[in-house]
Amino acid sequence: MEKQQKAYKGVIDYFKKKIMDGELRPGEKLPPERDIAEQLNVSRNSVREAIRIMDMTGVISSQQGSGNYITCEFQKSLAETMTMMFAMDQIDYSQISQIRQALECLAFSLAIEHASDGQIEEMEMLVKELDKSTDDVKNAALDKKLHFMLAQSSGNILVLDFLEACSGVIDSFIHDMRAEILRTEERKKLLNECHKKLIEALKEKDETKGQEALKRHFMLINEILEERENRKI
């Protein structure tokens, strides 16, 4: 058993080195299990275990009938870790919200320098759609996309991955949170004012204005969620 454990770790280390040396890039297909086993002189069970772990951690994607591909989607394993921590009461929503706020503030600062005109225009369009839409489900999707676009426009993949992981935890455990926040016209109006000021600040490259808009945005969300929790007591 111990020998097999060392063998699958050796397979993982082999592919890790290949990736670090630039010999394997995202999108490239791994050789068949049999070829890997023969090349590394290990059992196919060890190769399968290594592939299973690399799939779980986001290094590869196993596609049935097609094979295994390098993806390096580490956000996947990060989201799974945070989801388990939330499920086991190791973290709560307030802690996730604190991280989200800090990262979105950082994302905004970076977006001032890195956001393209096209990205800013797309975020403006999302804010306008939110203003007009009366569909709760659509509003929740638009809000999620807007915050994703802000993270993406930061140009920092770690900021994007961490924020996506936070969003995944929220979607897993507080299914209707976004819809509830945007359900009343007054709340929707207040939050969308924050969105508008945020995009205006991005266009104007106004750091202070943008940070104030984000601070107000998270204050409103946390107030709403506190009310929600109090109703459960």
Where are these regions (language model features)?
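Short linear motifs at protein or domain termini
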Residues: 1-99, 103, 109, 113
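Juxtamembrane/interface motifs at transmembrane-helix termini
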Residues: 3, 48, 115-117, 142-143, ...
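Solvent-exposed, non-membrane alpha-helical residues enriched in polar/charged side chains
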Residues: 16, 20-21, 151, 199, ...
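Short loop-to-helix capping motifs
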Residues: 32, 155-157, 205-207
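All-alpha effector-binding/dimerization core of bacterial HTH-type transcriptional repressors
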Residues: 73-149, 186-212
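Cytosolic histidine kinase catalytic core of two-component systems
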Residues: 118, 157-158
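C-terminal all-alpha effector/ligand-binding and dimerization domain
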Residues: 131, 169-233
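Short, charge-rich, low-complexity alpha-helical interaction segments
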Residues: 160-170
